[in-house]
Amino acid sequence: MKERILVTGGTGYIGSHTVVELQNSGYEVIIIDNLSNSSADVVDNIEKVSGIRPAFEKLDCLDFAGLDAVFAKYKGIKAIIHFAASKAVGESVEKPLLYYRNNLVSLINLLELMPKHGVEGIVFSSSCTVYGQPDELPVTEKAPIKKAESPYGNTKQINEEIIRDTIASGAPINAILLRYFNPIGAHPTALLGELPNGVPQNLIPYLTQTAMGIREKLSVFGDDYDTPDGSCIRDYIYVVDLAKAHVIAMNRILEDKQKDKVEVFNVGTGRGLSVLELIHKFEESTGVKLNYQIAPRRAGDIVKVWADPSYANSELGWKAETSIEDTLRSAWKWQVHLREKGIM
């Protein structure tokens, strides 16, 4: 029998790509998602891509009784990959309580239910935001956790602590915390990609929608930072490369190969790229010109961060393999697909 994995937020951007990779690796996947920032159509597209239809339950992770019922319905769930969260830095500054409730209580509910239902492990979707503005770059897993620059970043820090404290108390759970950098791009089939409800909060969907003429112009938030061109620098990782890291982490937990009950890995490329460099690479890679403007700095943004992924490279045998050019072309192909389908 295939091992059952629960994926929260599985119709979301990173979640949907990870479900495909899990199914391709032989896992049976159950998705729960409240569809607040995604659509049930994603389940159809996962089936088209992988040839397998995952089980899907529309559910909010804040619903403790509902979660309990899902674990009871799908007996024998071995582990969880927890993506479900509110994730926009700027919005979190404006709506901190929404972020604290959604992101903290959802994890607490899962951790309370895991021992009851014999769930062995959790792969947690953490973030490079836990490092704040690092003292040294590239940033390693040993870098100090800084005061968060946004409520979103703070929820990731607190959630990491909640997991550590829960396991330290003797809970029969193992965890891997994956600190992602900036996932971008879309599945090579152009059947899965980033499709936020409403105005995009992330750079790439806003960029591709601007290139398509859906948005008038792209705002670059700040050109006076202490970077070569004045715009923020990030480590942009292809979403399928990131999804594969989750499968490797899941294998590691279930094969009992962890060195500690809680392990942390940076998941990035090791290359920093400024927002303006990214725009120019998009234009060069696709031949599409972008209408962009410089706007004031945005609250909660850090200046520059990129990963030292060497620990994940050596310990997990994982590496980001896809070039930034191919990644950006995949994002544009996805946007073109949405236009052809009349979705956007």
Model-found features: residue ranges?
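Residue-level signature of the cytosolic catalytic core of signaling kinases
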Residues: 63, 199-200, 271, 320
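Short, flexible, glycine-rich and Lys/Arg-enriched loop motifs at helix boundaries
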Residues: 40, 181-202, 213-234
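C-terminal substrate-binding subdomain of Rossmann-fold SDR/epimerase-dehydratase oxidoreductases
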Residues: 206-344
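Short-chain dehydrogenase/reductase
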Residues: 100, 149-157, 193, 197-201, ...
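N-terminal Rossmann-like NAD(P)+-binding domain of SDR-like oxidoreductases, especially those catalyzing
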Residues: 1-186
